[in-house]
């Protein structure tokens, strides 16, 4: 695995806390760990002695994605831990495009996992969270008891051809002057 990147504080953006103050259905207080100069936010709810369920969100969301799942998991007696990936939600956002590599995201989240000391976890991951979360499992399999994968996978890099649909999405995300993030997230949610 790549060594932990350290980001210059002058190149870090941070969303003000008051932007999260009145969000419906998400009463959870964020905790923070600093990894490589970045503040990574996460929620940690439920009994400390319970084996955790680690919820890894996809792109372009944050831990808020799981707001409908968290109450049920807590009611069942589980501990729930849900980080905001770097660049999303309450976590810091590097301002330099070159800092946003897949290797950096994996290194940051492995560092976070070690700092929070995730043990005996059930990983629930989807979308971009699966690409990072499954690498966390391969890095430290002894920290995980179970894996639940939704809408994701772990490409080996040997497929040779990037799917056309992904190329179209990447071009849209990179070059579109109009990026309706709310509509994009909403279109992937049950109504």
Residue ranges and their predicted role:
Residues 55-58, 82:
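Structural cue for short, hydrophobic secondary-structure segments
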Residues 72-74:
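Short hydrophobic signal-anchor/transmembrane segments that target glycosyltransferases
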